[in-house]
């Protein structure tokens, strides 16, 4: 495995660990064992098709095009998670997809569902 492939694999494992820190059972996809083409870099993340990139040269539109193409079969939201050396991890997605997520958040929190699920009534 070349250094750049190792760096990419390390970053994918790192991002999966970040998701696990938030309670998701994220794992790195093993793309060289038959999961190619439409496979995300990470699996078991609800709603998102994640492409992970740890590169110094940013080609964000190319990366997003890859995520959009590869997510078509699953219907998940194409998302690019990226960083460069000595910088924080960032996430990008299409604006319409962001607004769908934000609207879902807004609807769920307006009734307090995110923090406190509604109690069942005895009536």
Residue ranges and their predicted role:
Residues 1-123:
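Catalytic phosphate/metal-binding cores of nucleic-acid and nucleotide-processing enzymes, i.e., regions
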């Amino acid at each position: 495995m070349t250094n750049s492939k190792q760096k990419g694999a390390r970053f994918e494992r790192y991002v999966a660990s970040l998701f696990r820190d938030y309670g998701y059972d994220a794992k790195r996809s093993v793309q060289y064992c038959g999961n190619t083409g439409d496979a995300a870099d990470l699996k078991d993340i609800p709603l998102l098709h994640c492409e992970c990139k740890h590169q110094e040269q940013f080609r964000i539109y190319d990366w997003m095009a890859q995520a959009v193409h590869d997510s078509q079969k699953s219907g998940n939201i194409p998302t690019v998670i990226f960083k460069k050396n000595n910088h924080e991890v960032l996430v990008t997605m299409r604006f319409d997809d962001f607004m769908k997520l934000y609207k879902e958040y807004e609807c769920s929190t307006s009734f307090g569902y995110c923090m406190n699920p509604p109690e069942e009534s005895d009536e």
